[in-house]
Amino acid sequence: MRKAYLIAEVTVHDMEAYEHYRQQVVATLEAADARFLVRGGKRMQMEGADEAHHDNLRTVIVEFPSMEAALAWYESPAYITLIELRQSAADGRVFFVEGT
């Protein structure tokens, strides 16, 4: 079975609310047997359009056992309750990619 990866690129505009989201999301990921590969950290953009608000830009990569597990997590009642909190604290893109 191929692993799946959540990739999120978000610009945080409410750090307090985003930190509240970050603290709560961990338990939902642990329950889905997922793990963080990247959680923030230093970014070095090498190509493409320059992103505004570098200090508030976050990249997150999470590994899931499969695409099915990733989708089940995203649609789970535990995570659905956190989506609104994340969206109120940050704007960005969230997508899944299947690994090889």
How should these model regions be labeled?
Residues M1-T100:
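Conserved, structured core segments of small domains
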